[in-house]
């Protein structure tokens, strides 16, 4: 890994199978002398929800509406919404220009804390859903559509429409 101006260049990468995440990351850091390099790991067991919102809502009202939709989902599932860390991505709905499509992602706060604590001696800077981060591996073009398939224990199919993540499908083995 090297830095040229404001860009970070990854000169090599690979796949490592592991039983213990902490030991594996320590080994990779040692092998690559990457002691000062920020680390990003994949989120696991995240929950995806999709909401359609009226496009004319203000940002404040949109945020409240998304929160309300998630709380309703949690109520239906018997979940406490306070145990989740949530983020969302908003894109245009190509089928209905009056609506926005919201991809809402929720992860258990306790599991996030466990991962953060396990890697606290390293330079962990982010925990990201692989389905969203994987889009950074390709250069998208306007008006082009893409499907990215990531095959692991859980297979994810990320649909990109016109440079925006539109949908994420997950399939268990």
Describe each PLM feature range:
Residues 1-19, 27-31:
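N-terminal basic/disordered segments at the start of proteins
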Residues 1-2, 12, 95-173:
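Small-residue (GG/TT-enriched) beta-loop-alpha framework at ligand/catalytic clefts
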Residues 7-10, 56-62, 120-125:
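A short alpha->loop->secondary-structure connector
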Residues 17-24, 58-62, 66, 111:
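Short amphipathic alpha-helical segments
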Residues 24, 28, 114-115:
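Hydrophobic side chains in well-ordered alpha-helices
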Residues 27-38, 74-79:
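Phosphate/pyrophosphate-binding loops at sites that engage ATP/ADP/AMP, CoA/4′-phosphopantetheine
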Residues 32-47, 125-128:
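Short glycine-rich phosphate-binding loop at a beta-alpha junction
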Residues 43-102:
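Internal amphipathic helical hairpin motif
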């Amino acid at each position: 890994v090297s830095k040229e101006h404001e860009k970070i260049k990854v000169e090599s990468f690979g796949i490592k199978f592991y039983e213990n995440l902490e030991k594996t990351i320590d080994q990779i850091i040692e092998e690559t002398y990457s002691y000062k390099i920020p680390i990003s790991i994949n989120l696991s067991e995240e929950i995806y929800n999709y909401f359609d919102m009226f496009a004319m809502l203000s940002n404040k009202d949109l945020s409240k509406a998304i929160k309300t939709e998630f709380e309703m989902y949690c109520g239906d599932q018997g979940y406490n919404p306070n145990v989740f860390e949530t983020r969302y991505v908003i894109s245009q709905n190509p089928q209905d220009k009056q609506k926005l499509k919201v991809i809402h992602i929720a992860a258990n706060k306790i599991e996030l804390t466990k991962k953060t604590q396990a890697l606290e001696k390293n330079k962990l800077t982010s925990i990201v859903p692989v389905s969203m981060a994987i889009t950074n591996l390709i250069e998208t073009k306007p008006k082009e559509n893409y499907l990215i398939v990531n095959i692991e224990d859980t297979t994810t199919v990320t649909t990109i429409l016109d440079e925006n993540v539109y949908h994420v499908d997950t399939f268990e083995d």
